[in-house]
Amino acid sequence: DRSHERVQRREILIDSFGSVAGQVNALTVLDYGDHAFGLPARVSARSYVGSLGVLNIERMVDMSGPLQQKSVMTIEGFLKSRFAQEFPISFACNVTFEQNYGGIEGDSASMAELCAIISAVSNVPMRQNIGVTGSMNQFGEAQPVGGVSHKIEGFYRICADQGFTGDQGVIIPLANAENVVLREEVVQAIRQGKFNIWTVEHINDAIELLTGMPSGDRTDGQYPADSVYGKAME
């Protein structure tokens, strides 16, 4: 409750409306042993000229565990397979969990991190009214994560506090769909069209939901200019 009150007072910066380039709401769980609850975290990414690829700020300051570090290397593998087939990767991008002071472990935010990075490099805004959870492999396939019900309810509460718009909701891996057990209040909000749950099988699906644009299919070594990946290659 105190954490959500801090969001309401703007001490923790989370928005459930608008679109921003290089910023995604990742769904997380805070576990205090006898009590766990969901609270979204803002993942931000900033890109610039260079050839260093992804720079994980948490890793650089020893605030990330081995699973989180592995997830960032997985993201790098995916990015290089998409954008460095014919020439070396030609960007650098810092990615971090904003207002994180206790360390990060796990790979459940890797889809959110990848979306923030792609958004920063392409300068295509990401919807803030959608929270994201899900692990991914180097092929971009969405993988199931733990605590999905807590995560959904955590973002639902943020949306309820800030006001429903009808287009808010969460993205989760399809493999997690059978694990979702929600409070009746959340179930009713979904039935009434106030809140949504989208399931995805691939990171491309998440990118398209968050941007409203095609992610892009490569033809003859090029992505369409009007796609997210095409803009990332510009």
What do these predicted regions represent?
Residues S3-S16, V20-N25, L39-E234:
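Peripheral, non-AAA+ core regions of ATP-driven protein-machinery
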Residues G22-D34:
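Structured beta-strand/loop patches that form or line metal/cofactor-binding pockets in enzymes
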